[in-house]
C-alpha cells in the first residue's frame, strides 16, 4: 500500500472531478475554436489539430516510457494544453515548430515537474514563450483573417498591439486612428490590415461566451478574469486621459491575447492562487505587468510573460494570503 502524502495547506475539496473541470474548459473553448476556423480557416484547423495531437502523444510517450507510469490521457489536460498552445500561435506557423513547442510545453512545462498538479507554470504558456524566444520571426508573422483556404502562403498584416507600440515609441497619437473601432475588435476585425493575430485571440466575444459558460458551470470563479480585465481597463484608461498617445481602454482590452489569457490561462487551477483574496491580488498584478510590458517592454504583447511571472509568485500568495484558522488569535508580544 502506498503512503498518502499530504502537501502543505491550503487545501480545497469539491465534488467536481478533474475530468469534469477539464472537459468543461474544452467545451468553453468551442466558441473561440469555431471563431478561429471562421477567421483563419484551414490554417487554424491545421495548427490546432497538430498542437493537440503532439501534446497528447508526448504526454503518453513520456509517461509510459520515461516515467514508467500509467497514462492519464482521459483527464483531458493534454488536450487543453494542446488547444491553448495552438490558440497562442499564428495560423501559418510551420508544423515542425508547433511540434517543438508541444514537446517543450509537455516535456519541460509539465512532465518534468511530475505531471498534472505539480507544474508551477502554465504548460501552454511555457511552450508559447519558448517558441517566441526561439523563433521570433515565425511567431510574429501574422496571417490576415479571412483567408479561409490559406496556410503557409497567407498574407501577413500588422496587429493592433503593434500599432499601439509604434504610437508610443514615436509619440504619434495619429497612428491610433488606424485601429478598428471597439465593436469591430470585439467581434474580430477583418480587412487588409487587421484581424491579424494568433488563432485564438482575434474574436473577444467568443472568448467571453466561454467565460460565461465556465462561470455558469462553476468551472472557475470571476475573481481572476475580472480583476485582470478591470485592472488593464482602468489603468489604460487613466494613461489615455493623461496622454492620447496611449490607446483607449476598449482597444487595449479587446486586442492581443488579453481575453484569452485572462479567461483561459491565468485561471489554471494548478498555477493560480486558491483563495479569493489571493486570486484578486494575482489578477491585479497580472494586469499591471501586462500594461508595463505592452507599453515599455520589447514585445508588443505582455500577457504570457505576466502570467508566467505571477505563476512563480503563486506559492508565496498561497502562503501569506490564506483564511485565518478558527479560534486563532495573534500571539501576545
Residue ranges: model-predicted function:
Residues 120-124, 249-258, 279, 298-310:
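Loop-to-transmembrane alpha-helix initiation sites
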Residues 1-56, 60, 330-333:
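N-terminal signal-anchor module of multipass membrane proteins
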Residues 70-80, 97-103, 118-129, 222-230, ...:
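Cytoplasmic-side transmembrane-helix entry/capping segments in multi-pass membrane proteins
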Residues 9, 57-69, 106-117, 209-218, ...:
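C-terminal ends of transmembrane helices
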